[in-house]
Swiss-Prot record:
Protein name: Contryphan-Vi
GO molecular function, one term: ion channel inhibitor activity
Record-stated family: Belongs to the O2 superfamily. Contryphan family.
Pfam families: Conotoxin
Main location as per UniProt: secreted
Propeptide: 24-54
Lineage: Eukaryota, Metazoa, Spiralia, Lophotrochozoa, Mollusca
Residues recorded with modification Cysteine amide: 62
């Protein structure tokens, strides 16, 4: 049983090494991405966005 465990661990290390070496080298999209402005209306726009996303029950506020 001990030899089987060692064999599985060695296989896992070899596979992970192969994946790292053969990777395409691109950076993940979120590492250097520019943050999107979800609230272009400033603080009041942010408040309205929160109300809209939460299903605002008070329609004069939600528009």
């Amino acid at each position: 049983m001990g030899k089987l465990t060692i064999l599985v661990l060695v296989a896992a290390v070899l596979l992970s090494t192969q994946v790292m070496v053969q990777g395409d080298g691109d950076q993940p999209a979120d590492r250097n991405a520019v943050r999107r402005d979800d609230n272009p209306g400033g603080l009041s726009g942010k408040f309205m966005n929160v109300l809209r996303r939460s299903g605002c029950p008070w329609h004069p506020w939600c528009g």
